[in-house]
Amino acid sequence: MEKRLQEVLEKRFHKTLDTCTKEELFHALMEITKEATGNLKKNEGSKKLYYISAEFLIGKLLSNNLINLGLYEETEKVLKSHGYELCEIEELEMEPSLGNGGLGRLAACFLDSIATLGLPGDGIGLNYHFGLFQQKFTNHKQQEMKNPWITKESWLNRQSFTCKVPFKDFTMDGVLYDIDVPGYDSGCNRLHLFDVDTIDESIVPENSINFDKKKVQENLTLFLYPDDSDDAGRKLRIYQQYFMVSCGAQLILKEMEDAGYDLHELNNHAVIQINDTHPSMVIPELIRLLTEEKGFTMDEAVEVVSKTCAYTNHTILAEALEKWPMEYLEEVVPNLVPIIKELDERVRKTVKDESTYIIDAQDRVHMAHMDIHYGFSVNGVAALHTEILKNSELKNFYDLYPERFNNKTNGITFRRWLMHCNPMLTRYIESLIGNGFKKDATELEKLLAFKNDEAVLNKLEEIKMEKKLEFKEYMEKTQGLTIDENSIIDVQVKRLHEYKRQQMNALYAIYKYLDIKAGNKPSTPITMIFGAKAAPAYVIAKDIIHLILCLQELIEKDPEVRPYFRVLMIENYNVSKAAKVIPAANISEQISLASKEASGTGNMKFMLNGALTLGTEDGANVEIRDLVGEENIYIFGRKPQDVIDLYEAGTYSSKEIYEEDALIHKLVDFITGEELLAIGDEESLTRLHRELIGKDWFMTLLDTKEYITTKEKVYADYEDRKTWNKKALINIAKAGFFSSDRTIAQYNEEIWKLK
């Protein structure tokens, strides 16, 4: 590595390792890493996976790729010997802005595991220039700005592949960029990202995300999830989705033909995993291409496509199961309309249940319905989630096709979420149980032999303290916020949505503030950390961020409370910031309304790094509890079935709880009390106050009191540090099940059957 670095620095910059700048060193390392991944053998076989997703939240790639190539430690040593720290060099990398939340991060973990297991499988998505948005806090509010991440030199490699995508009023030329995905000590796959050369980045002003949504040829791949609060925004999403699936379908068919396969046997050589409903149009688009360009009859095309496509459902929220008005499709992609109508007609001939039709009475096209009828597999992403799909949300489909439904509990790549973000913990685990866990995560169970070993438990606490100090330094440097490393670090980081209930955590912050003002000081100081972006058009979510930032300001300026309790919000939360905060956390907040979180993967990352979960009986929390035991997790709140029953009965009333419970009344009214109104925006705080009392769709007030009681117990339990550390060790030891390597092995065994 040293010799190669010297060569590249000399050739490119006429510098040496002792005279180059950090920026030059970063570019040299990137070049060497790209070269090394390019030289890896491609994972090949007679059947290939295409994982198609609107999001791939891949994070920074330099360190991740060095780890997977087996070059990380050598690189670290070389840099150290010349006075550099690799972690400082990687700070210079721009984080690719190709995803938003758990959906995109899961896709990234999956690509890592697919490559690591040596399976032939590529990702297909879009090359967003500005991503979701860059978040800035201004006047205690979220401000959205464009997030340009594509630099002159990046991980993107332009390919020769091009294709034509036909819309109603024009045709667009798709171009392809690839990012190499090296497996850990394995071969290499690719992430295919489609783009257009007519994109004009200048149509978006600085410090803004506003642009003319009708100029599709100039704006198509600028943003992930463009604001869909108007017709133009909704149509732009259809343009994006169709462009992605048409380019992807054309690439798939070309690769199959180039390999000499008969397209009538497509399902023997390709499998397409539809990640949530955004890529659903790949089904009618493949049928269109096969019938219009490859000489297939409609029957032949429908049959082979139905045997090739599989669908992953990621949500129980009806709002997230996309339904597009037929008139929009007629205005954007009229080519697909007769095919979708034909697919719906075929369902109507054999199925009497109208709720399962693809086109409903309002002339809306249900994407998930198309995926289920014309795919061979439907999977949920956690045991509880899949049961809810089968028994409630998708029951009518389960009754039709029970054999298609299966569960694949989500997982995370331990390369990024342990080896990369917590090397100190990784090395210590290695010293205790060897390095087998890097390839087989279930070997972490060997740690259970040390659960009563005081020296081991003390060392785990030391490592946690080191990570807290690193996080403290990072927050001071990036946001000017100081953190007490001796405090309990209590973290809720995830996209902002009412069902995830950041607002309930904020109500607890109000409770704690008032409690300390009343003279009840906690034994150990508490630092509550939030990190979240709210969708630009999601008003209440932005109001919740406003409330949290107002509480932060209130407490920071209160000398009575600040030494004992802090509320801090991470600005522009992303993968890089997750890698800083997760290893520092003592408590992992997973407090969604039971039955609403499909799985969650943050819960797994925190567990792996020795944080204890405070959560509801929801998503993968249930499986964490089953693995670690009731005594090593803190579960509170209504059970999933109780919540489902309440929705069905329509009897939940937050107003009743507010009026009858003095404590809840006091906490909710504090939102519009004089302390916060002196800091915040009255309209925003009043709207949130009104929402909690008048609607509270995700039943915040129902669980608030039990949440407060349970959280107080968690803080009290932290005082017995030996028992706490034992619980942390048990969580780490039992985290092996949540490796995405296990998830992918199950997908392959039961769905993909790659060869």
Residue ranges and their predicted role:
Residues M1-K755:
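A conserved ligand/cofactor-binding region detector
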